[in-house]
Swiss-Prot record:
InterPro entries per record: IQ_motif_EF-hand-BS, Kinesin_motor_dom_sf, Myosin_head_motor_dom-like, Myosin_N, Myosin_S1_N, Myosin_tail, MYSc_Myh3, P-loop_NTPase
Coiled-coil regions listed: 840-1933
Organism the protein comes from: Rattus norvegicus (Rat)
Biased amino acid composition, Polar residues: 1269-1282
Name this polypeptide is given: Myosin-3
GO biological process: ATP metabolic process; muscle contraction; skeletal muscle contraction
The keyword Thylakoid is annotated on this UniProt entry: no
Gene name tied to this protein: Myh3
Amino acid sequence: MSSDTEMEVFGIAAPFLRKSEKERIEAQNQPFDAKTYCFVVDSKEEYAKGKIKSSQDGKVTVETEDNRTLVVKPEDVYAMNPPKFDKIEDMAMLTHLNEPAVLYNLKDRYTSWMIYTYSGLFCVTVNPYKWLPVYTPEVVDGYRGKKRQEAPPHIFSISDNAYQFMLTDRENQSILITGESGAGKTVNTKRVIQYFATIAATGDLAKKKDSKMKGTLEDQIISANPLLEAFGNAKTVRNDNSSRFGKFIRIHFGTTGKLASADIETYLLEKSRVTFQLKAERSYHIFYQILSNKKPELIELLLITTNPYDYPFISQGEILVASIDDREELLATDSAIDILGFTPEEKSGLYKLTGAVMHYGNMKFKQKQREEQAEPDGTEVADKTAYLMGLNSSDLLKALCFPRVKVGNEYVTKGQTVDQVHHAVNALSKSVYEKLFLWMVTRINQQLDTKLPRQHFIGVLDIAGFEIFEYNSLEQLCINFTNEKLQQFFNHHMFVLEQEEYKKEGIEWTFIDFGMDLAACIELIEKPMGIFSILEEECMFPKATDTSFKNKLYDQHLGKSNNFQKPKVVKGKAEAHFSLIHYAGTVDYSVSGWLEKNKDPLNETVVGLYQKSSNRLLAHLYATFATTDADGGKKKVAKKKGSSFQTVSALFRENLNKLMSNLRTTHPHFVRCIIPNETKTPGAMEHSLVLHQLRCNGVLEGIRICRKGFPNRILYGDFKQRYRVLNASAIPEGQFIDSKKACEKLLASIDIDHTQYKFGHTKVFFKAGLLGTLEEMRDERLAKLITRTQAVCRGFLMRVEFQKMMQRRESIFCIQYNIRAFMNVKHWPWMKLFFKIKPLLKSAETEKEMATMKEEFQKTKDELAKSEAKRKELEEKLVTLVQEKNDLQLQVQAESENLLDAEERCDQLIKAKFQLEAKIKEVTERAEDEEEINAELTAKKRKLEDECSELKKDIDDLELTLAKVEKEKHATENKVKNLTEELAGLDETIAKLTREKKALQEAHQQTLDDLQAEEDKVNSLSKLKSKLEQQVDDLESSLEQEKKLRVDLERNKRKLEGDLKLAQESILDLENDKQQLDERLKKKDFEYSQLQSKVEDEQTLSLQLQKKIKELQARIEELEEEIEAERATRAKTEKQRSDYARELEELSERLEEAGGVTSTQIELNKKREAEFLKLRRDLEEATLQHEATVATLRKKHADSAAELAEQIDNLQRVKQKLEKEKSEFKLEIDDLSSSVESVSKSKANLEKICRTLEDQLSEARGKNEETQRSLSELTTQKSRLQTEAGELSRQLEEKESIVSQLSRSKQAFTQQIEELKRQLEEENKAKNALAHALQSSRHDCDLLREQYEEEQEGKAELQRALSKANSEVAQWRTKYETDAIQRTEELEEAKKKLAQRLQDSEEQVEAVNAKCASLEKTKQRLQGEVEDLMVDVERANSLAAALDKKQRNFDKVLAEWKTKCEESQAELEAALKESRSLSTELFKLKNAYEEALDQLETVKRENKNLEQEIADLTEQIAENGKSIHELEKSRKQMELEKADIQMALEEAEAALEHEEAKILRIQLELTQVKSEIDRKIAEKDEEIEQLKRNYQRTVETMQGALDAEVRSRNEAIRLKKKMEGDLNEIEIQLSHANRQAAETIKHLRSVQGQLKDTQLHLDDALRGQEDLKEQLAIVERRANLLQAEVEELRATLEQTERARKLAEQELLDSNERVQLLHTQNTSLIHTKKKLETDLTQLQSEVEDASRDARNAEEKAKKAITDAAMMAEELKKEQDTSAHLERMKKNLEQTVKDLQHRLDEAEQLALKGGKKQIQKLETRIRELEFELEGEQKRNTESVKGLRKYERRVKELTYQSEEDRKNVLRLQDLVDKLQVKVKSYKRQAEEADEQANVHLTKFRKAQHELEEAEERADIAESQVNKLRAKTRDFTSSRMVVHESEE
């Protein structure tokens, strides 16, 4: 209970909502004695407050508050609640729950103007008959987001709870506002709509749907009410603003809870009120609003006056209502029309047609002289009417008086009488008004449909309340029937479903029958041969009248149905023809005019004029009306069956059934409106009236079940998640605990009453109020946790601040110490000297540093300029990419919203599917009810015949009557026997077709037979009771006549007593036999149900496994689709690669014509080449990731196939076992069926005999008792009636036990529905998981996009470098064209190499395409299989398919982005190759350039240029050093980039593993959810045939998959052989390369020896010794740098050896390089021979050697580049690390030897010339480089060999796995074929059984028709006997009156 401060938020409404604290304190302090204060039954006020004065002798003396003394029985005294419970807000919390306590609580609250009160789960509201300030905006804000217990009772609280339930439970809600007419339903409906429009407003007032909208959606929803009330509300006897139509307003909300749209459905407009009203009533408000003259332009427009009495149609009752201001209401209506967007033309047409209806009532007609035909009496009114309707007045009058009627194929003009014309005018008026109203509703719905995305809706139902008028017609019957159905829905929801929920969840609960079943009255109205059925039947007969309709009602129901009675005649009251006992009271109905109202005929000639009217609205209203003329003109148009005769009652029932279906799909919230008094007096309450409504509405029963039961329930998982915070230690982290056990531990650890909750199978149930307590405890716990968290955070922040303060303190101390020390020494002389000298010491060094810094500054400035330009360019690209990224994000966001909408629509469809399944079950139950009714009617006919025979014959003919009854009994027994056989056969067929899963046989044997027998007994007893009561009345009125027959009765009495004793003895024997048979039958039924459940469990397991197979196959299809997309992407990449290879070849042809390039450009190209290699590594890593994913998927596929094979084996074994058990069960079932049939037959016979004898015994006993009572002055009548009442109560108890059995039988169905709901929740969770997976995919897409952007930048840089290289090539082309001619042969060789590479690439592309084609075929087959397997799911989940389509579209978008990325990577790869080719050609051009320089130097041979040459070479060496320094920097940068890439790669691999684990979890969850759903879907009848087709297709698919696996295995074997051949070739090539390298080393040593001998003769070279030493130092540094570069290249090799596809090509290139090295060795040998033969040509030989060395260097560098490419392809071969270490040591030793020899060569070369020494040193360095490159290539070749060995092992393992899979699939195919054969055999058996049952059914149908003929004959005899009985009764009444 909130305090006064908390209630201040409600403003002035607070006193009207809740008691103040002062009042509560005063109530608690009032004196109260629980023993004496009480309520007592009072004849005046039903109940009165009083005090107990005394109690003695079974009587209690009570003194009331008005000082009256009453003496009553103890059962008439009720306990009173303590004063603190006065005006309690929830009556379920009352200590003593009884009728007076509820009544006085409502009365006390009503006196204080607190009109809303909770009553358990629903709300009760009392009409205040005055305005209260409880609907203001402050009150709306006060209730927004409040829980029910946090705010006082109010309609806003109910609305907010429904709104919150919709958001949290994601379920449609409904608010049912019910009550009698005048109880305030319409007002509360408007308040609900006001609340939703306020709290869920869209928030954008400026946004309009289109140009038609004059207001926001909230304004339009609110404005719809005034317009509908104006045209659909009217004053009645009990209500000034009564809704004369029903409406169901659906308010739709979007995903965020904002208003999305709304729509309105209307039901049964009371159109008869347009032309007729009672005296105390009036017509619809719109007529009087128009006549109020608030808008004079309407008076002129409609040609009317302001006096309502000028218009008979609207002035038959009252014309003014005190509580309604028609003038203001007209303004509100007109404003609503504008807000709702009606066009001016539509608005004008609306008013015109309303005015035309008023004018219709003034049209007068008279009879022609000497004729019966009518003619117009004046045309003025007709002219006005025709003007408003856009017609010709003469045509209108002619059509009314002389309509055209179709006779045969011709039309004739028929004359009408005056009465006929008036009836036609009335019908047309009502039709125009009704169609106008329906069009208006449709137009409002169009305006409220905003096309915004919807998610859920809240429906508000406002139906006309229960009506009891003086004159009640067909409209009142429809309204009251609707309220009867709604009350039945309420009872079922509150009492039946609630208790069935307890049973289903396994909670200990005793079923309570509250006696609220309204089925009798509902069946009387709507069932076959009910009131509506007879009404429609009479409407089909042309000569039927209201009297014939009344007679049929009497014949069918009078005396047979307790709810149908003949009304009592009351003087001064309108004549009534029959009475119905409704839940709210007895209503007298008059059938006058019912046939005409139901048929609703119209003058078709006038309707034809309407269709051609110039008033567009009128023509539109009747555009679809099918007249006879239209039918004649459109003979070929197909007409819907029955459309020509759609009665009002049939349309009403159709709409009502639709409404009930809508309500069943929602979560209802009930609001019960109460009328306090009949006089509309504010504050007054009539106890009897309110008590009657409370009893009828089930308020007390609802409170009881709320108190006794467990109204609050939560799923275990939700409870664990929400309330775990109460005691987290009870549920430890990191440990799996079942949700149910966790909830049990959690609740056990909390200090609450453990009797206040129960644990069900899936939920935990709470008593009323306990959940609120838990919420308060949770809020307190959260407050403590948040407070503690805040304290920890604040402490941490302060500690951080303290540490900063301490650091500042220490810094200050340090600064102070240094300053003090400086101040102490700054005046010291030596320190001054130090200050002066120190700057001078650094001046020289500073100048050098300044010079260096200036140079660096200039370089930095240039680089800054370049970087600035590049930065601007990148910024522009960044802006573009950011824009693209934003667009993509918007697109992804839109797609995600659409995805969520599609998921919600999918959920709604699934729910709709479940609802349809529930409807199917209901239809089945209805069919069973129909069969029961048929049996009931047959039994009733038989009893009527017995009755008639008894009345017809004298008591002396009792034996003849018994014989006749026996004969009819045997005939009926035969009929029941046939029907029983038919039902048993049908049940067996249904059970087999649904895999014997439904326990219909049990329901048929145990429930239907027993229920039918017991209901027959109960009906016979009730019939007996009514008959005896009637006989009592007759005997009382004819007592004197009975005295005359006393002598005869005495004689018959003695005879009957003898018969009675015999009958009693036979009855006892029969009852004993019946009990024994019942026990045996129940035992057999129990055994059968156990066997049936066991079979169903086994079959369910089989279906689950089969569905799991289907789901795995669907998953395989998805994986194959992904593989196919990957393969397609690769094929595209390969194609682009081939294109780039051709372009590269063209560029190579052009570049080979060019000359050399400088060493600076070479270094730049090396740098670019390194960048290209990095980008290519990234590309290859991405490719490897894709390949790893494919390999993982394949492995998963193989594992899944293995599991499937094992499961299929298990299934086969289980199936065989089940089939064996099934055959055994079938035999047992047949035996049991035969025994049950025999038992049921004997049971039925015995029961028939028993009932007959009971009837005879009861009649004899009644006659005997009546005789005795007449002799003893009726003193024994009371005791006899009490005895009969006891007997009936015993029978009612038996009926209750039967009902409890029925509830248990229904429990299975409700449990299935609950399981489906649970599965739906699990599927929602799975979809949420998929949404998370989608987000991760989007994240991957973003990463790929970023990678794409980086690659775009790299591409741009490559293009710039390429353009620069092309410009340089163009410069050198003109200079070295002559050299290009000499290199034609080399060009041809390069072309051959490129051609060979192209051919290999094409072969690989063809192989990939072949695989893609194979996978495409496999995909198509799998798709076909999946489409067939999932046909049932797709039928129910069409929107889910749309969702999947959207997902695939999104995947395509991702694939496109991946494709773009791969294209860019392919472009980079091509550019990389192009750059390598350019680098190679640049090396060649450089060599040519150096050769030309050497030749120039040789021709001149001038010694004077030697020193200049040395200087030039020195400068070149310095430049090379700088270049080496730059390369060192670039190497370090590349190492950093390499480390970053490695980290990114590791993160990507971790993310991939995480995603794979997530996918596995999702797959498992999906498999579980889908298996559960499929298990339920598999219960449908059509599943057997579908499974047969599916298994056949599965066999075909498996066969295709087997073929595909065989082909893939062959392909793997072929690849294995090819790889083995390649490996052998690689080994041979490597051995050749090793030998050639050894030979090269040997040749090199011999050349060096020769150089030593030669250099001994070069004495003049001693002058350059110092220079050579310097050069030697430079060479050493260069060697160290080259060694570091070797290490860098080795690291690069280890990072980039992953691309497998180009291995074969690179091996071929290696072979070619070996051949080139062989050629180089040959040239070296030739050089050696030249040196030995001719020392005089030493100079030329040295130059030749230098040229050859340069060529070798070029080839070596090319070999290094190619080796790097090959190493990128062979990364996975890391098993050779030990071998690499050994090779590394050998190489280091070789380098040392070469270095030592180089030193010796330099010492010997001192004697030679400078030029020769310099060239020889150059040659030595080049040979060293060549040797190192060759060693690297050898090492890399060994790596490649290891890699291919491991690859061969992997392929071998994969081939073995494929072989195993093939064997498993073959076994699977064999087993499935066997299964298909068995299913075919079962199908044939089912067909045979169906034919047998069809024959039995036809036979039973024939016998049924014969029985119906006999029943008709008996019915005619009954009618005759009734007539005789009436005559006999009337004669006895006359005699009685004469005696009196």
